[in-house]
């Protein structure tokens, strides 16, 4: 069976938990937990986690010089960040997309589905 990574993209300027009530935050996290638990119960979940929004390092090699440039923050040239990921077991892209289609992250951002090469 193949593995597929679901990269959960979101705009941190749009989805800000500090602007939400504690009840709303718990409701959102509950939706993610229920979805994750269902995938695990069906034997489809291979892993996953939320990533910190405000931390990280972007590393870029300078062509031919051997120098590496390191920038603070997870951001490339995009407003969106990868907020988290899941790894699912599926027979095909079609099945992976079907499994991801009711992931609660679609309420807040986009999901990029990619097959992991074996």
Positions of predicted regions on the chain:
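Conserved, structured core segments of small domains
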Residues: 1-118
């Amino acid at each position: 069976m193949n593995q597929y990574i679901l990269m959960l993209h979101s705009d941190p300027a749009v989805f800000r938990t500090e602007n939400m009530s504690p009840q709303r935050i718990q409701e959102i996290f509950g939706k993610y937990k229920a979805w994750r638990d269902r995938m695990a119960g069906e034997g489809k979940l291979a892993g996953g986690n939320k990533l910190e929004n405000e931390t990280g390092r972007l590393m870029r090699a300078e062509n031919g010089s051997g120098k590496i440039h390191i920038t603070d923050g997870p951001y490339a040239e995009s407003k969106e960040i990868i907020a988290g990921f899941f790894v699912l077991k599926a027979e095909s892209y079609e099945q992976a997309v079907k499994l991801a289609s009711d992931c609660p992250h679609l309420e807040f951002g986009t999901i990029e589905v990619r097959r992991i090469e074996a």
